[in-house]
C-alpha cells in the first residue's frame, strides 16, 4: 500500500463495512462477489479490476511436507486439487459474472475495467524482490510469476 502512496490500516473483515461507511478507511481490496455479497457497494462508489490477486486462491505446499507423503498420498492430493480447481473455476466465473453484472447495473457505482497493470507491477517490483530475498524464496517467487503468465 505504501508503494502507492497510501497507509495500510488493518481492519477485521466484520468491521470493514462500518470502517468504509465512517471513513476510518477510504478503500479496501475485494473482488466483485465479495463487494456484492456484503453490500460494500452501499458504502463505496468504485471498483477497480486490476487483477492484483488470483481468485480462487492458489494452493501451495512445502516440498518438505510433500516429500514425506507416499506416492499414493501425493497422487490423491494432486487429483483432489485438479477436481477442486475445475469446480471452483466454473463456480467462481459464474459468481463473478453475475456480481459484475449486478454492480454495473447500479446507478451510483462504477466498475473500472481494462486497467493498465504495468504501473502497478513496476511499483511493487522492488518490494517483491526485497521480500523474496529476505525470505530466501527468490526461485519460488520467480516460478509463481512465470506460472501466472498462463492465466
What is the predicted role of each segment?
Residues 1-151:
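N-terminal secretory/targeting leader peptides
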